[in-house]
Amino acid sequence: MNGGKECDGGDKEGGLAAIQVPVGWQRRVDHNGVLYISPSGSLLSCLDQVKTYLLTDGTCKCGLECPLILPKVFNFDPGAAVKQRTAEDVKADDDVTKLCIHKRKIIAVATLHQSMEAPHPSLVLTSPGGGTNATPVVPSRAATPRSVRNKSHEGITNSVMPECKNPFKLMTGSSNAMGRLYMQDLPGSQQQELHPVYPRQRLGSSEHGQKSPFRGSHGGLPSPASSGSQIYGDGSISPRTDPLGSPDVFTRNNPGFHGAPNSSPIHLNRTPLSPPSVMLHGSPVQSSCAMAGRTNIPLSPTLTTKSPVMKKPMCNFSTNMEIPRAMFHHKPPQGPPPPPPPSCALQKKPLTSEKDPLGILDPIPSKPVNQNPIIINPTSFHSNVHSQVPVMNVSMPPAVVPLPSNLPLPTVKPGHMNHGSHVQRIQHSASTSLSPSPVTSPVHMMGTGIGRIEASPQRSRSSSTSSDHGNFMMPPVGPQATCSGIKVPPRSPRSTIGSPRPSMPSSPSTKSDGHHQYKDIPNPLIAGMSNVLNTPSSAAFPTAPAGNGSVKSQPGLLGMPLNQILNQHNAASFPASSLLSAAAKAQLANQNKLAGNNSSSSNNSGAVASSGNTEGHSTLNTMFPPTANMLLPTGEGQSGRAALRDKLMSQQKDSLRKRKQPPTTVLSLLRQSQMDSSAAPKPGPDLLRKHGQGSFPISSMSQLLQSMSCQSSHLSSNSTPGCGGSNTALPCSANQLHFPDPNMNSTVLQNSLTQSIPLRGEAVHCHNANTNFVHSNSPVPNHHLAGLINQIQASGNCGMLSQSGMALGNSLHPNPPQSRISTSSTPVIPNSIVSSYNQTSSEAGGSSLPSSIAIAGSNHPAITKTTSVLQDGVIVTTAAGNPLQSQLPIGSDFPFVGQEHALHFPSNSTANNHLPHPLNPSLLSSLPISLPVNQQHLLNQNLLNILQPSAGEGDISSINNSLNNHQLTHLQSLLNSNQMFPPNQQPQQHLLQGHQNLQAFQGQPTVPCPANNNPMACLFQNFQVRMQGDAALLNKRISTQPGLTTLPENPNLALPHFQDTPCELQPRIDLGQPMKDGLVMGGQGDASVDAIYKAVVDAASKGMQVVITTAVNSTTQISPIPALSAMSAFTASIGDPLNLSSAVSAVIHGRNMGGVDHDGRLRNARGARLPKNIDHGKNSSEGDGFECFKSASCHTSRKQWDGEQSPRGERNRWKYEEFLDHPGHIHSSPCHERPNNVSTLPFLAGEQHPILLPPRNCQGDKILEENFRYNNYKRTMMSFKERLESTVERCTHINGNRPRQSRGFGELLGTAKQDLVLEGQSPGSSNSLESSLVKDYIHYNGDFNAKTINGCVPSPSDAKSISSEDDLRNPDSPSSHELIHYRPRTFNVGDLVWGQIKGLTSWPGKFIREDDVHNSCQQSPEEGKVEPEKLKTLTEGLEAYSRVRKRSRKSGKLNNHLEAAIHEAMSELDKMSGTVHQIPQGDRQMRPPKPKRRKISR
C-alpha cells in the first residue's frame, strides 16, 4: 500500500496548503474536475469513488500512506494547489511502478496485448453490425462507463486499479474522458455525463491513453467502439477498426473496454443508460454495443466472436471479470472481490466489478451482437443481457488483456467467473448468473461493485438490472436468468467469440471445474486454460465467429492466451514477465489449438464450436446459454449453442482434466472421433446443439448447479452441461416442474441457460436442465449440451443434446449437462440426437447429433423426446409428438436409428397415440439397430434410457441412444440423416407391418406400457409430466404401445401380438421378432427399470449425476431419491423397485405392466441385439444373433449369449432378436467398426434387452438372466468392463427377479457402458471388472434383484468411484481392478453401484453374481422370480433377493469383499431409500467378512 515512500504516498504535508499526490498516483484536472489515476490506471473522480476504490479488494493502493487521510491525500478541488513533484517523487513513482504488481500487470498486459495486436483488425472487421447496434448503446455506455468507472474507482479502484487499469486505464488511457467520467462524481450525473462524457472520454481517451499502455487514442474504447464507437459516439466503425487495427487501440480498447465496456457493462448492469436498456431490449447489436463498449469488438456478435477484437475483449478478461462483477454487482456478494484483491487480477476484478464487469458485459454485448437476433429475439431482456454479458466476457478478455483489469480478471477468474461463476451462476443463478463461484470474489467484486453500483447510478445494478438485464439479473428467475445469462454470457460470449471463449473456458460449465481450476490452479489454469480454454477458445472462436475468419487469430490473439495469462497472473500475481510468458504460451497454445480446432471444426460456426470447442467451448457454451438461448433462433444462436455445447464439453473436460481423468481424453477422443466421423453433420447439429445449449438454461439455480455439477463432474452433458436446443426445455425437465415448457423455453430456458451455463449441460450442460426441451424446439434443434454433458456433460450439458434432445449435458450435459436432457422437436433427434447429443456433450456426440438433428428436422416435431436430467440428476426422457412416418424412408436405411427415434417416439407416441404405432415398430426395429450405434452413447443415453423408460420404448431408445452415441460417431451421420428417420421409415415398412399388429396390440400394450414406462415414467414422470403433462402418461402408455406394446404385455399376450408384429417387424428389421421376443422375455416391469437403470448408468458413465426419482408411477421412491445420485436415485427407485415394479404392475395392471416392461426390455434387447448383430453384421439364428451381439460386445459374450440363450427360454426371444439382428447386421459395420466399444455396446444393447426381457417371465427371465449373467460373465471376461448393462440389469433388477433378466439387459447396457467407460471413464474404472467379479456382481445383483440395488445406477462418476472403490476393495485381486472397473462400469442385474454419484458416497457397489442373477431366476423361479406384483417393496425385493441369492449363489461365487460390498451397498441403499432391505441375517452374516475385504480394498 505504501508503494512509495510513506511521505510520498501521502505527504502529511499535502494538507490544505499543497496537495501531495501519492507516489505512483496521478492527479489530473480538467473541465470535468479532478481525476486521480491510481497506479493501476483506475480513474477516481470523487472522494466517494476513492473510498469505494480503497475499500475494494484487489484495487491498487500502492503509494498511499499508511494512515490514509482521504481529504488530505485526495483533494478533488480543481483549484487546490498541488505540491510540485520533485525528482525524488518521480523516482518514487518509478519505484512504485516497479513494485506495484498492478502496474506491472497492466504493463505486461499492455505489452502482451500489443504483441497480439495483429489479429485485432480482423476482429474489428468482424463486428460491422455491432457498431450499429452499439450506437444506441454508445451514449449510455459512455455514460455508464464513466459512472461505472467512478463507482469502479470508488469501490474497485484498489482492486480494480490493476484491473481498473482497464477501466480506469480506459478512462485514463483509453478514455481519459472515462476518467473524467469517473471524475463526474455523481453517479447520476456521471451516468448522464457518461453519455456525453464517454464519447469525450473516448475522444479524450487519447490524452489519457498515454497514461496506460492501452492508451491507443480511443483504441481501447474503439475496440468497443467498433461496436462501441457508435456506442460511444467515439469514432465510428472506423475507430473500431482503427483501434482494432492498431495494437494501441486494442490495448486501449481493452482499457476502453474496461472503460467503455465498463460503462457498457455498467450500462448493462445499470439502467443509467437508456441505450443499455435499449441495448438489452433494443437490439442485440445494441446490447452488443454495450458489451462492445466493454469490448469494442463485442459490438458485433460476429466481430466479437470472430474477430481478434472479439478476442481482445476476450482477452479483456478484466472485462470478463467485470461482467462477472457486473453480474456480481447484481450480487452484493461482490464483497468478496476484495478478497480477490490479493491478486492483481482480483484488483482488476473488483475494478471490473466496480467497473461493472461490464467490461465483461461489454464483451457480452459483443456476444449479444453475435446473438443480436437472440438479444433482440429475447424480449427477455436478460437474454440480451446474457448475450451481452457473455459477449462482454468474451470480448472482455481481449479488453482485459490490455488492461491490468485483465489480470485481475483471472483472479476474479474471469474464466472462473464464467467458470466458477458458472458454478456459482448455477448456484446464484437467481442472484446473478454471473456471480461466479470463483467470482465469489468477482461476485464480491461485484458486491463491491454493487455497492459501488448501488452507490452510484453509474454502475447501478438496478440500472444494469433494469436496463441491461440487471432487472432480470436482479430477479433470480427471469432476471436471474438474465443475470445468469450475463454470467453465462461471458461464458457464452467466449463461446460465441472464439477468442473470448478461451477466457470463457471458465464458462459456467467449464467454470465449475475450470473455475475451480482457475481458482485452484491459476497457473495451471492458464496453462490448462490455454489448453482447455484455448481449446475452447479456439473452439469458441470457430464457434463464436459466424464468420470465423479471424477466429484463429483470436485464440492466438491473446483473447484466450491473454486471458489465461491474466488468470495466471491474477491468480498468482505473476510478475509481468511471468504473465507475458504465460500469455505468450497461452496464445501459442491457443493459436495452435485454434488452428487445429478451426480446421477441425471447419469454419462452421456451429460445427466449429462443436468440434473446435468440443473441449473448450463446453464452458463457453454454458456461458453462452443465455445468449445462445436468445440467439437460439438466430444464426449466432447457433454459435452460442455450439459454444454452449462445446462449453459444456469444455467444462466437462476441464473438470475431467482437473481430475486428470482419462474420461476427458476419452471424451475428447470420442468427440473428436464423432467430429471426424460426422464432420459434416456435426456443424449443423453442433450449431443446433449450441443453440440448444444456449437455450439450455437451467431455470432453477439448483438445476443449474446440478446441471453444472453434472456436466462438470460428469463430462456430460451440456448437458449439461450440458444444454442443447432443448436446453430451453431443459429447465422444463428440471425446471419443468417449475415452469411451463413453453415459458421455460424463453424465460426459464434463458434463466436456466444463464444459470446453468451449463451445461448443466454443462452441460450441460449439461444435466443440462436445458435438455428438457421446450417442445417447440427451435432451441431444441440447437442442441443443448452436451453435452456434453454430457450431458451433460449436460448434458448437458451440456449442449449435450444436439437436437437439444440430449442436453445432458448435459451431458451431461451434463449437461447436464447436462442435467435435463430433452429432445424436443426432432423425432429423429430424440433418440439419435439425444444419444448423439449426449455423446456430443459428453463425448463427441456432436457429429451424431447433427445428423440426428438434421433428420429430426423434418419430423423432429413428430418426436418430442424429452430427456430430462432432473436436478437430482435423473434424466427423464419423454417422447411426445408424431410418428416419424415421413422419416421412415430414412429409417429403412438405418432402421435402428429410426427405431431409436421410434422408441423415443413411443414416448411421443404417448402424447400422440397415432405416433406410438409407427414409433413402436420403429422403436423396436430401430432400437435394436440403434443400440449398436448408440452403444457407446449407452452411458450417455442411459440417461435417456432412464427417461425413455417413461416412454416404455424409451428404454431401448435410451439404450439405443447410448449405444448409438458411440457408434453414432461412425453411424451418426447416416444414422442421423437416415437412421433416425429410417427407424420410423423402416419400422413403418416393417415395424408398421408388425406395428399394425402392434397397434392392434397397442391398446393392450398401452397398459403394459406403463409397466415399461412406469418405472421410468414414475421416475421421470414428475418431471416429464410437468414437462409434457399427459404426454408423459401417454408416453408411458404409448411407450408400451409402440414397439414395447406388444412385447410389454404378458410374454404370451405381448408376444402373440408382437410376434405378429415381430414377424412384420422382422421384415422391417429382422430384429423385429427377436426383439419382440426378447422384449417379451425381457420382462414387463423390468424394461422400465432397466431403462431407468440404463439411463442412470449412462448418466453415471457420463459422469452425470443421475438421480432417479420415481415420480408418477413410482412416486414414493421419487421423493427420497431425487437428491440422491443416480445411483441413490436409482436405489430409491429400486428401493421402490418393488415400488417401481408395483407401480409398473399397477400401471400395467399386473401382468400388463410386466408386459410393458417386457416390451420395453424386449425392445431394448432387440435394440441391443439388433445393434449387436448389426454391429457384427452377422445374421444369426437366435443363438447366432446372440452371438453376433456378443461378438459386438465380445466374442466370448457372443457365444455365451448363444449358449445361454439356447439354455434359456430366452433362446426363442433371442430368435426374434436374431431376426432383428439380421437387419442389424446391415448396420453392423458401423457398430462393428468399434469392435470393442461399439461392439460391446451393441452386445450390451442386446444384453440389455435380454435382461429387460427376462424379468418378464421369471423362468424365462431366469433363462435370460442366466444367459445374460453368463454372457455378462463371459463378457466380463471379454473385458466388457464398462458393464453398464450390469447397471441396467440392476435397474431391471429393481423390479425384482426381473433384475436378473435385467441383468441381461444390464449386460447389454454394461457393454455400452463399458465402451463408454473405456473411452470416457477409463481412469477410475478401467476395464478391470473380471468375469468373476462381474459374475459375482451379477450374481449378487441377480439374487439381490429384488433389492433393486440395480436401481441405483451410478453416475459415470459413480461408476468411476465404484471402480475405484472396487479396485480398492479388491486391491489384492489382480482382477480386482478389472472387476472393479467392470463393476462400476457395467453393473450386472442385481448390481447396485454407488459409484461417485454426485453427492453420494461411492458404494463399494452391490454385485449380483451372475449365478445369483442367473440362478435366482433360473434356479428358483418361485423365489428368484420376483413379479412386479410380488416386489411390492424394496424390503420384499431384498428378501426375495437374499433368498434367491442364498440358493443360487455358490458360496465361492461372490468374492467375500464383493459380498460385503453388496451388503454395504444394500444397506446404503436402504438408508437412502429409507427402507430397510431386510436381508436375511444369514445373508448379512455371510457378507460380513466381505466388508472387511472391501474395507481393505477401499
Swiss-Prot record:
InterPro entries found in the cross-reference section: Methyl_CpG_DNA-bd
Output compositional bias ranges, type Basic residues: 1487-1498
Per the record's keyword annotation, is NAD included, yes or no? no
SMART domains in the cross-refs: MBD
Region annotated Required for interaction with ASXL1/2/3 sits at 57-68
> What remark does the entry add?
Named 'methyl-CpG-binding domain protein' for homology to other methyl-CpG-binding domain proteins and the presence of an MBD domain, MBD5 and MBD6 may have evolutionarily lost the ability to bind methylated DNA and are recruited to heterochromatin by alternative signals.
Instruction: Kindly provide the name given to this protein in its UniProt entry.
Output: Methyl-CpG-binding domain protein 5
Q: Which organism is it from?
A: Mus musculus
What high-level taxonomic lineage is stated for the organism? Eukaryota, Metazoa, Chordata, Craniata, Vertebrata
